[in-house]
Amino acid sequence: MLLHYAQNSRAVRVAWLLEELNLPYTIKKYKLGDKEMREESYKKLNPLGRVPTLEDNELIISESGAIIQYIISKYGNNQFIPEINSKEFPSYLQWFHYAEGMIMPQMNIIVVETIFLPPDKRNEVNLARANKLLSKMLDVVEKNMENKNYLTGEFSAADMMTGHAVIMSKNLGIDFSNKPFLESYIKRLLSRPALKKAWSL
């Protein structure tokens, strides 16, 4: 498998899973914003010119959640996903999709308003609203983590999705002083060798 990868991007989620499963793969490394990702040769793989994109023989797939579901379904041997009839499975689905449904939309606004836009184009109202909503979304995860080591109890792909989003929120400068369970959760995730490797590629 060939993973098109950039540090501090959602591609880390995919590399994390590949490392947890100890699957062989190679990476094509970019920096976020690289012109190479906007070239037609890459847009044939990913029309949006973004990472991650995974090539598995003739198959090409993008979107981190879709890639993770594909890898687990094809190569996971039932690892990192609860049994479908278990009481944990619905919770797993909820937390797997919480990253992109609830956390990342607010983070995207914050990144645009604080990094991508020039100062004279920034909207402080949008930024304040996104920060408030992101904190609210993280509070829900905080409450869930009160009596758990991982989102559904056992470590799963939901942690690779939403756990990664939580870490990125912290890296973005969101205040975690009133989120002690998330602070512990982040430390627990960052201690995993597979994530250490995925983040350092």
Predicted features, each with a name:
Residues 1-128, 142:
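GST-like domain detector, emphasizing the conserved glutathione-binding G-site
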Residues 27, 154, 178, 198-199:
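A generic structural-conservation signal
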Residues 66, 181, 194:
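Residue-level recognition of oxygen-bearing side chains
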Residues 72, 165-166, 199:
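Active-site-flanking alpha-helical
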Residues 91-94, 184, 197:
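Short, solvent-exposed alpha-helical surface patches in well-structured domains
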Residues 99-191:
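GST-like fold's C-terminal all-alpha helical module
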Residues 134, 193-201:
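Charged/polar, low-hydrophobicity segments characteristic of intrinsically disordered regions
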